[in-house]
From Swiss-Prot:
Gene3D superfamilies: Leucine-rich Repeat Variant (1.25.10.10), Zinc/RING finger domain, C3HC4 (zinc finger) (3.30.40.10). It comes from Oryza sativa subsp. japonica. SMART domains: ARM, Ubox. It catalyses: S-ubiquitinyl-[E2 ubiquitin-conjugating enzyme]-L-cysteine + [acceptor protein]-L-lysine = [E2 ubiquitin-conjugating enzyme]-L-cysteine + N(6)-ubiquitinyl-[acceptor protein]-L-lysine. ARM repeats lie at residues 441-483, 526-568. This is U-box domain-containing protein 4. The keyword Repeat applies. The gene is PUB4. Its EC number is 2.3.2.27. GO terms for cellular component: cytoplasm; nucleus. GO terms for biological process: protein ubiquitination. The keyword Cell cycle does not apply. Residues 296-370 form the U-box domain. InterPro entries: ARM-like, ARM-type_fold, Armadillo, RING-Ubox_PUB, Ubox_domain, Znf_RING/FYVE/PHD.
Amino acid sequence: MAAAASASSPVEFLLRRPAPRRRRLPLAGAFFAPTGLAGATLLRAVASLAASLVAGARPPSQRRNVDALARRLALLSAILESILLDTAAAGAFSDAANLCFRELYVVLFRAELLVSYVASAGRAWALLRSPHLAASFRDLDAELAVVLDVLPAASLRLSHDATGLLDLLRAHCRCRAPAQYHDPDEAALRERLMDALRQFDLGQPPDHPSLQSLLADMGISTAASCRAEIDYLEEQILSQEEDTDLPLVGSVLALLRYCLFAVFDPSNAKALRDWPLSGNRQRLLSIGGGDDTSFSVPKEFSCPISLDLMRDPVVASTGQTYDRPSIIQWIEEGHSTCPNSGQTLADHRLVPNRALRSLISQWCGVYGLQYDSPESNEGMAECVAASCSSRAAMEANKATARILVRMLEDGSENVKAVAAKEIRLLAKTGKQNRAFIADLGAIPLLCRLLLSNDWMAQENAVTALLNLSIFEPNKGRIMEQEGCLRLIVGVLQNGWTTEAKENAAATLFSLSVVHNFKKLIMNEPGAVEELASMLTKGTSRGKKDAVMALFNLSTHPESSARMLESCAVVALIQSLRNDTVSEEAAGALALLMKQPSIVHLVGSSETVITSLVGLMRRGTPKGKENAVSALYEICRRGGSALVQRVAKIPGLNTVIQTITLNGTKRAKKKASLIVKMCQRSQMPSAMALGSTLTVVDRSLVGNNTLRRAASFGSGELSNPISISVQVP
C-alpha cells in the first residue's frame, strides 16, 4: 500500500492518519475480496482474519452476540486449518471453492467491522442501538450460513473430523431464533435508562442512588468517562443516521449532562476543566488564518476557478467539481460553458460532492486546520437543538443549568471555570436553553468572571455571554447589567487569550444588531478603537468578527465622527485588500461616506478605488453590491475630481456593464447612477468613459431592468436587518 500511495497522491495523508472512530453501522454497501488472491494464499488470508476475530477482545456491549460469533469462527478456523494442513488439497482449488473463500472473506471482513463498531461505540449509544446491532449479528449468521451451504466440501476432500465440524457450524448458524440475539440484561439496562427519561418527562429528576447504579451498570464510573459518552452522542446526532431517533438520543445526552454534575463531585473538577472541546464544539477557523506555510493544498482539493481550497465542492452537469460560490458566480456572470472542460452546461443544477468534502475535511484534520464546511455551522447547531426538543431533554437541561448556576455562585475558582465552560456548551444550541440559563441569573455571575485571573474562566465566560446573546431578549439583559459592557470591552482590550478577545468582539457584533445599543457601544471608551485594531492586526476569525461589528455600528446615523476619530475608517480602508473581510469593509465604508471628510479620505487613495473595482469584479453578489455602493458614494459626494479618478480605472467599463446585467437590484441601480454621473462630468476622461458606457446603454435599450435602473433617482444604502452568528 505504501508503494501505491506516492508523495503526489492527494490521499497520501490518509496513510498517516489514525483510523477515525466509526460512526455508522458498517454493514450497508458493497465489499470486495482482495484481488489477485486464490488458492492457498486466499485461504490463509481467510483463516488469519477468522483467527484474529476469535482472539480479539470482547466489547462490553453485545457480549452475547460477540461470544456466539467467536464460537462459530473458532469452528471455522479449525476447518480452515484442517484444509491448509492437507497440502494436496491446498495446492489448487476449484473455481467454486475459490469463489466461496472470497465470499467468506467478505463475510468475515463485515464481521470485523461490526465488532470494531460495537467496541468503539459509546455505552449509551450501544444501548440505544441494541435492537439494530442484534439484527446485524443475525444478518451475519445468515450470510455465513449461505456461504457454508454452497461450500464444495467434497472437492476440498475434508477429513472426517473437519466434515463433522462443518455440519456442526452449519447447524449453529441456523439454530438461533431471532429473540435469542437480544440480550435480556442489555434490554433490562435499556429499560432502566428509558425509565430515567420518563421521570424527567414528568418533571421529577431521578434520585441520585438510582442514577449512580444506572451509570455503574453502564460502565460509566468517572466524570471523564461520562464526558466521553456525551461527546460520542453529539457525534452521532451530527452524523444523522437515517433511522436515528434524534429526540431520544438528545434526551439521553441531556440526562448524561445532568449526571455529569449531579452524580459526580463537581468539586473534583480537574478532569472536566482539562477536557478538550471536541472538534464539533470548536469555533471553526479559516484556512487563511493560519501562519503555517509548510504544506500546500493538493490541486485535487483546489477549485479550478478560484484556485483556493474548496469549502463546498459541488459537481456541475459536465461532471467537473468546483467550489459552490465560484461556480455560482461564474454562472451568474452569464457564462454557459464549463470553465474546466469548455462543454456547454446542460443545466445549472449543482450536486454536493460529499466524498471529496470528506477527504478535504480529513486532510485539514491531519494538518491541524479546521474545515468550515457549510454544514458544520448552522446545520450543526440546528441539528443538536432539534435533538434536544423533547420535554425530557428540556427538563434535564434545566436541572443541569440550576446546578451550574449554583457552581458559579458558590464554587471555588476552579469550579467556576468548569461551570462557565459547561454553560457555554449548554447555551450553544436552542433558544430554550439560552432563555432559562438567563432566567436562573447566570448573566451577572458570568460578568464577574470576566475579571478573573484564570484564563479559562475568562474565556469561557465571555463565550457563554456570546452564546446567550444570540437569544434576542438576552441582549437587553446583558446591556442592562451594570458594568457588563465595560467588562466585555475590557476583555477585548486585555483578554488573557486570543480566543477570549475574539469572542468579546463577536459579542459586540451580536449586541450591535439592536439599534438602541449601537450608540452605547460606540460611546464605550476603547470599544471602537479595539475593534479597529483587531481588524488590522487580528487573525482571520478576529478580523471577521471585528468588521461585522464595525459594519453594524456604521448603520447608526451618528457613527461617522466616532469611526473617524477612532481610526476605524483607516482600518476599513486597509481591509479592502483582504478578501476575508473586504465585502463587509466596503459595506461599512459606503454607509460612513455620508460625511464629506470620510469621502475625501477614502477617495484620496488610488488603491481604494482599485480595490473596490476588483471587488465588483470578483465578489459575491452582496459583496459586489457593497462595492458599487461605496463607489457610488465616492462619485456622488466627492466632486468631479473623484469622478474623473474613478473614470480612469482600467476595466471599469466591463465591470459596470456586467453588474447592470447580472447584479442585484440595488447594485444595478447604483451602477446605472455611476454611469450617469460620469456622463454628466465635464472632465475629458470622464466624458471618454461616458461615451463608452453610452454605447453599452444604447445596446441594452430593450432591457427593461436597465431602462428602469436608468430612471432611478439617488438612493441610500439600506441598513442591514438579519445576521448569522456562528456559535463557539
